[in-house]
C-alpha cells in the first residue's frame, strides 16, 4: 500500500454574514470562502494495525480522538468497515504551519486531507461531491476545504457554489500567539446582540443568498477588480469580537491604514488578514506594521491566494 503526503491550505472568509437561526441550532450563513497557500503537510502511512495513530509536533494540537483529523479517519472506518478490516489502520502525521485556533480552518483542512488520503490509500475512488458530503459530517468548513478555491458557502457552510477563482493576489495573515477566540462564544454573542435582525423563513434565507450571490463582492471577483474586492469584504463577527479583543481591533486598524486592498478579521478570529496586489506590497506592509506594533508574540505570514483545495504532493 502507498503512503501519501498532502498539502492542506488555510482559508479566509472574504464575506461572512449571519442570516438567521436554523432548526438544528446552527446559524444560517452566507459566506465567500477563499483558500490561501499557507499549508499544513499531512502524511498518511498504513501501519498494519487496526487503529489510527496521530502525530504532530505542535504542542497545542491534540494527538488523540479529539483531533478532527482523527475523527475523519474514524468516520472513514465506520463508513467502509470492510476496507478498514482489509487495509488496516493508518499513521497520520501533521506538520503544522497554519496557526492554531486562528479562524483559518486549520483543523478542518487537516480533516479534509485525511479524507482525501484515505480515499487514495483504500482505493475507494470517491468523487469530489462524495468526499464533500462526508466532510460535512465533521464540521461546517470541512467540505469547503476538500475543494478550496473561491466558493460561496451557505447553510452551515457545507453547501458549496464555486465561483470564478480569485487569482493573482497575496494575503498577509497576522495573529497574536497568546490570543484565541472561542467560535461558539462569538456566534452566541452575536445571537444575543443581533437576533432581532435575523431572517426567519426559508424563503427569506434563499432570497438573501441570491442577493449575496449577485452582489458587489461576487461581481468584483468575477470582473477581477482587486480594489473593489477589498472594498466589499465583510464579516459580521467583527461586531462582537473587536469590542471584546482590543488587540485584534488595533491590529486590524493598523494593517488597514498601511495601504493594502482591504483588511478584515477572518472567521471568528483572532487572525486579521490584508489583501495585497503583490508579494512586495505585502512585505512592505508587514515591515511597517512591525515598527508600529512592537510585540514579541505577534506573528505574520505572507502567502498567495490559491484556487485549489487538498493537493497530493
Swiss-Prot record:
Organism annotation: Microcystis aeruginosa (strain NIES-843 / IAM M-2473)
Reaction catalyzed: 4-CDP-2-C-methyl-D-erythritol + ATP = 4-CDP-2-C-methyl-D-erythritol 2-phosphate + ADP + H(+)
Active site annotation, chain numbering: 11, 141
Residues the entry annotates as binding ATP: 99-109
Annotated GO biological process: isopentenyl diphosphate biosynthetic process, methylerythritol 4-phosphate pathway; terpenoid biosynthetic process
Organism taxonomic ancestry: Bacteria, Bacillati, Cyanobacteriota, Cyanophyceae, Oscillatoriophycideae
Record keyword Nucleotidyltransferase present: no
Matches recorded under InterPro entries: GHMP_kinase_C_dom (IPR013750), GHMP_kinase_C_sf (IPR036554), GHMP_kinase_N_dom (IPR006204), IspE (IPR004424), Ribosomal_Su5_D2-typ_SF (IPR020568), Ribsml_uS5_D2-typ_fold_subgr (IPR014721)
Keywords: ATP-binding, Isoprene biosynthesis, Kinase, Nucleotide-binding, Transferase
Gene: ispE
Class of the enzyme per the UniProt entry, highest EC level: transferase
SUPFAM superfamilies xref list: GHMP Kinase, C-terminal domain (SSF55060), Ribosomal protein S5 domain 2-like (SSF54211)
Name under which the protein is recorded: 4-diphosphocytidyl-2-C-methyl-D-erythritol kinase
Domain of life: Bacteria
MF terms (GO), sorted A to Z: 4-(cytidine 5'-diphospho)-2-C-methyl-D-erythritol kinase activity; ATP binding
This enzyme's EC code(s): 2.7.1.148
Pathway entry: Isoprenoid biosynthesis; isopentenyl diphosphate biosynthesis via DXP pathway; isopentenyl diphosphate from 1-deoxy-D-xylulose 5-phosphate: step 3/6
Pfam families linked: GHMP_kinases_C, GHMP_kinases_N
Function (record text): Catalyzes the phosphorylation of the position 2 hydroxy group of 4-diphosphocytidyl-2C-methyl-D-erythritol.
Signal sequence segment: none
Similarity annotation: Belongs to the GHMP kinase family. IspE subfamily.
Amino acid at each position: 500500500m502507498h503512503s501519501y503526503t498532502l498539502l492542506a491550505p488555510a482559508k479566509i472568509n472574504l464575506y461572512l454574514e449571519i442570516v438567521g437561526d436554523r432548526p438544528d441550532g446552527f446559524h444560517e450563513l452566507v459566506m465567500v470562502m477563499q483558500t490561501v497557500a499557507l499549508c499544513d503537510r499531512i502524511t498518511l502511512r498504513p501501519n498494519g494495525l487496526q487503529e489510527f495513530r496521530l502525530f504532530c509536533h505542535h504542542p497545542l494540537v491534540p494527538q488523540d480522538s479529539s483531533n478532527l483529523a482523527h475523527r475523519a479517519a474514524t468516520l472513514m472506518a465506520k463508513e467502509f468497515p470492510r476496507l478498514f478490516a482489509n487495509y488496516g489502520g493508518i499513521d497520520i502525521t501533521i506538520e503544522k504551519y497554519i496557526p492554531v485556533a486562528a479562524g483559518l480552518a486549520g483543523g478542518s483542512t487537516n480533516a479534509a486531507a485525511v479524507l482525501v488520503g484515505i480515499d487514495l490509500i483504500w482505493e475507494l475512488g470517491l468523487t469530489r461531491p462524495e468526499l464533500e458530503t462526508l466532510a460535512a459530517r465533521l464540521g461546517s468548513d470541512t467540505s469547503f476545504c476538500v475543494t478550496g478555491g473561491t466558493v460561496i458557502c451557505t447553510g452551515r457552510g457545507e453547501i458549496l457554489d464555486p465561483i470564478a477563482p480569485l487569482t493573482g493576489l497575496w494575503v498577509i495573515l497576522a495573529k497574536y500567539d497568546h490570543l484565541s477566540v472561542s467560535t461558539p462564544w462569538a456566534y452566541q454573542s452575536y445571537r444575543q446582540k443581533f437576533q432581532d435582525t435575523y431572517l426567519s423563513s426559508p424563503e427569506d434565507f434563499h432570497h438573501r443568498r441570491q442577493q449575496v450571490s449577485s452582489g458587489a463582492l461576487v461581481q468584483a471577483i468575477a470582473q477581477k477588480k482587486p480594489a473593489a474586492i477589498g472594498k466589499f469584504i465583510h464579516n459580521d463577527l467583527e461586531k462582537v469580537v473587536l469590542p471584546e479583543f482590543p488587540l485584534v481591533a488595533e491590529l486590524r486598524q493598523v494593517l488597514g491604514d498601511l495601504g493594502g486592498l482591504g483588511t478584515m478579521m477572518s472567521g471568528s478570529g483572532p487572525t486579521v488578514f490584508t489583501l495585497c496586489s503583490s508579494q512586495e506590497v505585502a512585505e512592505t506592509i508587514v515591515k511597517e506594521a512591525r515598527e508600529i506594533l512592537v510585540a514579541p508574540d505577534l506573528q505574520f505570514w505572507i502567502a498567495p491566494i490559491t484556487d485549489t483545495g487538498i493537493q497530493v504532493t
